[in-house]
Amino acid sequence: MVNIFWATSDYENSVLDEHGNFIEEGYRYDDEIKPEHITGRFRRIVMPRVLKDKQAQLDRTKDKAEVFTPSWVCNAQNNLIDENWFGRKDVFNREVTNEDGTHSWIPTEGKIQFPEGNKQKTWKKYVVDNCMEITCGEAPYLVSRYDTTTGQPIPISHRIGILDRKMRVINENVETEKEWYDMAEKAFKHTYGYEWQGDNLLLAREALLYTYIEYFMDKFNPKDADGNYIKDADGNLRVPTRNKIINAARWISWNLWQMDGIKMVVPDSCDKVYETDLFGETTKKQCPACIKGETNGHIGVKCIIRDWNLKKPKDWQPSPGEDPKSQPWQKIEFRSLFRSNQKETEDDEI
């Protein structure tokens, strides 16, 4: 089963072996992205859009309408969402226009205040509010580790993504590592995104995983007067355990997936369906929805994701070869995710 594939031809004639020859195997449009393709001496093969050359940016804009929203615009739009949720402006930051005409923001000081007396507007309810970035690219609306137009790192105190805001609220309200792990898991499991091109999806997943680690470090490591982390007596910094990081990678890989957002199937999969007739002749099956230009009814591979809140049905039985430990009853088609009437399992607590 393929996890994510390139879904772009940008890398077919751009990767060189140690002898200076082009490598095609593993970098073609339909090839799966594997660790050996992007690590070691190939670790700089996949780069954020801002670091790609201008021609590559233009080509991707023409081919797949790829555009990246400036971070200040992401912030302004996320602020509108929070203004509606909280019922007031400037909850996480205040937008400013600088003298040179550029835009930025000033983070609010102190702990985020939630509406009093409203059980549906608590900090825990905010953390588990479902959110999704469609055609997410590198996911700048979810996390903002760097400015999408300049490539400059953004410090945690100034980050503006939807998940960044959830993590800020968590860091302001929990005391113990156990509390942090529990609430961070909820935040990540309620944050979704999909993307067509595999390299963008890879960068988005990477950004979310680093975000998980960085907010833990920011919460549990003391800082000096300059804001630098102070190591312990053994010269170490506190980081999430290896198992916790692996768990986070699993949530992220389920919640950020590869999909054609118009057809709601795996990209190009309608073109790869074949049928065999009574005489053993194999022919390509035509997708009626593609022919008619319709959104529904595509025959491509359906995108299966997880509704992490679904409880195991009382009469559930595993299918042959199915591992109950993988909680397969949570797997659903993307279309049905936000139609779920499943009650929060943590409802009493949250």
Language-model-derived ranges and their functions:
Residues 1, 5-29, 275-350:
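Long, low-complexity, polar/charged, intrinsically disordered or flexibly structured peripheral segments
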Residues 85-264:
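Conserved S-adenosyl-L-methionine
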Residues 40, 79, 206, 210, ...:
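Charged/polar, solvent-exposed surface patches and flexible loops
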Residues 55-57, 77, 113, 120, ...:
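Residue-identity detector for glutamine
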Residues 1-143, 199, 262:
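Preference for the N-terminal adenyl/adenosyl cofactor-binding alpha/beta module
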Residues 264-280:
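Short, surface-exposed amphipathic charged segments that create phosphate/polyanion-binding patches used
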